[in-house]
């Protein structure tokens, strides 16, 4: 498929048959996009911005510049800041900074529980009115089943979106890589795939009773995928997978490649292929 695209001030004004070739000013810059792809602005649903508290890592300005360079025009920010995003004043701060410093769309989330402690549920209704689009404890998982059931009930009543990082803390404690041959070879604590599966299975079981809006932020294993396949006809939910787990496996960690100690960890090649097939 070929054709012309007219871009003015960063926006597509005309495309394909709507472009009149005779009316294109001679001063216009032409870019050959042969063998290239054009997408609408991409959305990143799991972004950790450094404001407030970790500006030395990243701020809204550097975040938006990096996002635009990769074709991302909208991001969903996680609440794992310092202080955390768990009250109205912090939401107001985040929205103001995003509006003043960012060149992209910022969609903030707030914590599921106060101060990310996993105990006391946050004020979903109040924070939604302030513009929060969903609730998550980010890189932390709600470990207490009773707390999670209360969260789901409230989320159903208020039509709130719940985003869960699926990982059993006790099973993953001190883990750095996938539990397997590579972990043994490197002498590192491993994170078993069933640490993820257990939380996925628990939450999807709860979801059968509460049927709230629920999203698993990232899965990494074939075992979790099997649970999802069994549940998808009974409950309504979505799930994500990291590009890391689609393009890399545990063998890529190698010696001293600490930047590949990820959460969730890189799994086996069989896991990677299963995730690709699942998509």
Where do the model's predicted regions map?
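Histidine-rich, glycine-flanked metal-binding segment
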Residues: 1-40
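Divalent metal-coordination and catalytic microenvironments
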Residues: 10, 35, 46, 67, ...
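Metal-associated gating/positioning segment near the N- to mid-region
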Residues: 34-98
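Active-site mouth loops of central-metabolism enzymes
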Residues: 45-58, 81, 107-120, 139, ...
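Short, acidic/polar
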Residues: 56-64, 116-126, 202
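Alpha-helix-loop-beta-strand connector modules within alpha/beta enzyme cores
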Residues: 88-109, 153-167
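Histidine/acidic residue-rich metal-binding segments in metalloenzymes
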Residues: 121-279
């Amino acid at each position: 498929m070929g054709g012309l695209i007219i871009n003015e001030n960063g926006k597509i004004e005309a495309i394909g048959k709507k472009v009149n070739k005779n009316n294109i000013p001679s001063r216009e810059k032409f870019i050959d996009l042969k063998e290239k792809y054009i997408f609408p602005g991409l959305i990143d649903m799991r972004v950790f911005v450094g404001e407030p508290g970790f500006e030395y890592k990243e701020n809204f300005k550097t975040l938006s510049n990096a996002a635009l360079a990769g074709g991302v025009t909208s991001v969903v920010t996680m609440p794992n800041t310092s202080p955390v995003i768990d009250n109205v004043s912090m939401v107001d701060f985040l929205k103001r900074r995003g509006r003043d410093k960012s060149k992209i769309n910022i969609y903030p989330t707030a914590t599921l529980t106060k101060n990310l402690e996993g105990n006391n549920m946050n004020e979903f209704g109040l924070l939604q009115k302030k513009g929060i689009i969903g609730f998550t404890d980010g890189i932390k998982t709600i470990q207490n089943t009773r707390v999670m059931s209360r969260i789901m009930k409230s989320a159903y009543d208020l039509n709130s979106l719940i985003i869960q990082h699926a990982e059993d803390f006790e099973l993953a404690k001190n883990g750095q890589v996938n539990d397997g041959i590579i972990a043994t070879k490197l002498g590192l604590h491993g994170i078993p795939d069933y640490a993820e599966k257990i939380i996925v299975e628990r939450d999807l079981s709860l979801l059968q009773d509460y049927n709230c809006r629920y999203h698993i932020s990232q899965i990494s294993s074939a075992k979790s995928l099997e649970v999802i396949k069994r549940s998808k006809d009974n409950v309504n939910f979505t799930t994500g997978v990291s590009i890391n787990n689609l393009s890399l496996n545990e063998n890529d960690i190698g010696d001293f490649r600490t930047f590949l100690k990820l959460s969730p960890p890189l799994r086996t090649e069989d896991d990677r292929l299963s995730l690709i097939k699942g998509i």
